[in-house]
Design a protein with these regions (language model features):
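Divalent-cation
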Residues: 1-171
Length: 171
């Protein structure tokens, strides 16, 4: 299924007030959004940033099961978009004493993304989906720039607070 697919990565995960989480996926050419629930957005962020977890999450458990059974997550493919719903496939390579084969399993894109990040497996989107989605690169750049500006303002406020704490009132 590598023919007709485009390599992508998770570019950003942003919480959208009262609507869940926006996962920005794409490459240097284009970016699109998949909305997921806030918990899944948090899991994807944890895998993306390599944040350690006290106990295994569901996707960690799946990864441990894959490891125990000599199953490798070869790649994930976001392969369809129907009525604003994305569909995806896990491409697994089984190579153990019982089986030697490649399997495709239908899965939610959010689970595919989390598992790909956890297993450091490549992610792809079908050409059909790629051509159908709207490019959100400018939106992501705008949001990122706004967040950076807010962060800079927060740092300036904190510095002002420190000056006030250390030397009286800031003017």
């Amino acid at each position: 299924m590598k023919n007709g697919v485009i390599a992508v990565r998770v570019k950003e995960v942003l919480l959208k007030k009262n609507q869940g989480c926006a996962v920005f996926i794409g490459n240097d050419e284009k970016t699109f959004i998949i909305y997921v629930d806030p918990n899944m957005g948090a899991f994807i962020t944890m895998y993306l940033q390599g944040i350690p977890k006290e106990r295994p999450l569901t996707h960690d458990l799946i990864g441990h099961i894959f490891q125990a059974l000599d199953v490798k997550l070869e790649r994930v493919v976001i392969n369809a978009l129907k009525n604003s719903t994305y569909y995806a496939r896990l491409i697994l390579k089984v190579d153990n004493e019982i089986h030697r084969k490649v399997m495709e399993i239908d899965a939610r894109p959010s689970d595919c993304i989390a598992l790909a990040l956890q297993a450091q497996a490549p992610m792809y989107v079908s050409r059909e989906v790629w051509d159908a989605v709207e490019d959100m690169t400018e939106l992501l750049e705008s949001i990122t720039a706004s967040a950076q500006e807010e962060g800079d303002e927060d740092e300036e406020e904190e510095e002002g607070d420190e000056e006030e704490d250390e030397g009286g009132k800031a003017f």
